[in-house]
């Protein structure tokens, strides 16, 4: 692998290898990469620019909005929408669908979480942007509506995330493997650093907020107890790694192997993570890397969405670990 392969060069190679991926799709991903550079610039200087802390409002989820959330949301809408490739967008921060600039010429749908893990911004923990891309169903950009956004995850044509941490990485898939790029600030480019990412079939870590233990159902509790039991034959006990930033926890488990668990609870019976712009894109990436993603009963990518901000339980990561989680959730163990 050439460490100096830029994201643009990689996309050109991808088109040659897979003719069904047209230049428009790679242009969409380039737009996302450009927007990520803008967000990254503010994330790394947030404490100096006075855009930390709360903005004094709540989003559609009822969550307090951080100033940087609003900044990231605006930057993504304007930077990605300016080229007229998207007819409609949906964001965690907006209750209704968004008609971006120049939407009249758009043929695609973008769903995104502008800054996942934003509650960690003030303490310098990794945060990220998650995105999902679909083709427009209605065919006519001026007629684009909520129905265009409510497509199954299996219909995604591209998905990815950007993690803003000790380094900045963009990880994406178009259904032809998973590839990661690290931002080199000396040249201002994303360079190919992780080609054809695959996740181990068995992991060694589990990521869950065990502070919610009393809210978990019996199946979830039994699964977590299973992971903590000592059994050299199955590589147990697993170690806990939980940051509280979905992008960061998922990224680590993707590379090292493990399972991320955000189950249904007594308080959140439908789960807490959002299906359309959190679970679906990460499930697409995970499956392309050889992993698995379910709600405990169904494949995430097969769920028929009913709402833009629909929530779901999520078990995602190494294939065998998720299969075992499903067995406990379904009462088979």
Swiss-Prot record:
Substrate binds at residues 116-119, 209, 242, 272. The keyword Cytoplasm applies. It is an enzyme of class 3 (hydrolase). GO terms for molecular function: fructose 1,6-bisphosphate 1-phosphatase activity; magnesium ion binding. Its cofactor is Mg(2+). InterPro entries: FBPase_C_dom, FBPase_class-1, FBPase_N, FBPtase. Pfam families: FBPase (PF00316), FBPase_C (PF18913). GO terms for biological process: fructose 1,6-bisphosphate metabolic process; fructose 6-phosphate metabolic process; fructose metabolic process; gluconeogenesis; reductive pentose-phosphate cycle; sucrose biosynthetic process. PANTHER family: FRUCTOSE-1,6-BISPHOSPHATASE-RELATED (PTHR11556), SEDOHEPTULOSE-1,7-BISPHOSPHATASE, CHLOROPLASTIC (PTHR11556:SF35). NCBIfam families: PRK09293.1-1, PRK09293.1-3. This is Fructose-1,6-bisphosphatase class 1.
């Amino acid at each position: 692998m050439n460490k100096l392969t830029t994201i643009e060069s990689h996309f050109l190679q991808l088109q040659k290898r897979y003719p069904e991926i047209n230049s428009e799709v790679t242009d969409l991903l380039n737009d996302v990469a450009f927007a990520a550079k803008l967000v990254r610039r503010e994330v790394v200087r947030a404490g100096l620019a006075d855009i930390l802390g709360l903005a004094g409002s709540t989003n559609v989820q009822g969550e307090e909005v951080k100033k940087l959330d609003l900044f990231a949301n605006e930057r993504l809408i304007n930077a990605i929408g300016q080229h007229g490739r998207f007819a409609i967008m949906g964001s965690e921060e907006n209750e209704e669908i968004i008609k971006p600039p120049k939407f009249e010429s758009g043929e695609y749908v973008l769903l995104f979480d502008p800054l996942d893990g934003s509650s960690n911004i003030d303490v310098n923990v990794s945060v990220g942007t998650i995105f999902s891309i679909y083709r427009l169903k209605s065919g006519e950009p001026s007629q684009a509506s909520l129905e265009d956004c409510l497509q199954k995850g299996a219909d995604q044509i591209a998905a990815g995330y950007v993690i803003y941490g000790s380094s900045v990485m963009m990880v994406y898939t178009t259904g032809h493997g998973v590839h990661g790029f690290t931002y080199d600030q000396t040249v201002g480019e994303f360079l190919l650093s992780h080609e054809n990412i695959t996740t181990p079939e068995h992991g060694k870590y589990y990521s869950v907020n065990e502070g919610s233990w009393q809210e978990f159902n019996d199946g979830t509790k039994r699964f977590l107890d299973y992971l903590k039991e000592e059994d050299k034959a199955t590589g147990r006990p697993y170690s806990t790694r939980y940051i509280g930033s979905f992008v960061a926890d998922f990224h680590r488990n993707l590379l090292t192997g493990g399972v991320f668990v955000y189950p249904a609870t007594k308080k959140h019976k439908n789960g807490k993570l959002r299906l359309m712009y959190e679970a679906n894109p990460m499930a697409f990436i995970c499956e392309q890397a050889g992993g698995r993603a379910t709600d405990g009963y169904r494949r995430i990518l097969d769920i028929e969405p009913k709402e833009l901000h629909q929530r779901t339980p999520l078990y995602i990561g190494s294939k065998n670990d998720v299969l075992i989680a499903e067995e406990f959730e379904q009462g088979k163990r």
